[in-house]
Amino acid sequence: MQFTLEFGGGLELLCDSVKIHKVNINLLNDSDILTMKDLLSWVRTNLIKERPEMFMKGDTVRPGVLVLVNDCDWELSGQLDTTLEDKDVIVFISTLHGG
């Protein structure tokens, strides 16, 4: 499955300062579905280069990270249980900024 992953609000610094990633992900289990929980695990293993604790806490994103799936807040679509489809665009934006 192909996805576009975008990181903003400083999260791109955890991915070698690359904001947009076009990725291909093979299904992690024998089913035909991939969930946000599966994707987050893949991102932690394959994209996050440093300080993964700044992006994730346990199995989910840290508080203060806005997640959009095809421009829709993931809280409206089931969060970790959100089912992803080929060519989806997932955006991660940190809403926490120093000052």
From Swiss-Prot:
One Gene Ontology cellular component annotation held by this UniProt entry: cytosol
SUPFAM superfamilies: MoaD/ThiS (SSF54285)
Stored InterPro entries: Beta-grasp_dom_sf (IPR012675), Mopterin_synth/thiamin_S_b (IPR016155), Urm1 (IPR015221)
Pathway: tRNA modification; 5-methoxycarbonylmethyl-2-thiouridine-tRNA biosynthesis
A GO biological-process term: tRNA thio-modification
Family of this protein: Belongs to the URM1 family.
Known role: Acts as a sulfur carrier required for 2-thiolation of mcm(5)S(2)U at tRNA wobble positions of cytosolic tRNA(Lys), tRNA(Glu) and tRNA(Gln). Serves as sulfur donor in tRNA 2-thiolation reaction by being thiocarboxylated (-COSH) at its C-terminus by MOCS3. The sulfur is then transferred to tRNA to form 2-thiolation of mcm(5)S(2)U. Also acts as a ubiquitin-like protein (UBL) that is covalently conjugated via an isopeptide bond to lysine residues of target proteins.
UniProt-recorded name of the protein: Ubiquitin-related modifier 1 homolog 2
Gene source species: Arabidopsis thaliana (Mouse-ear cress)
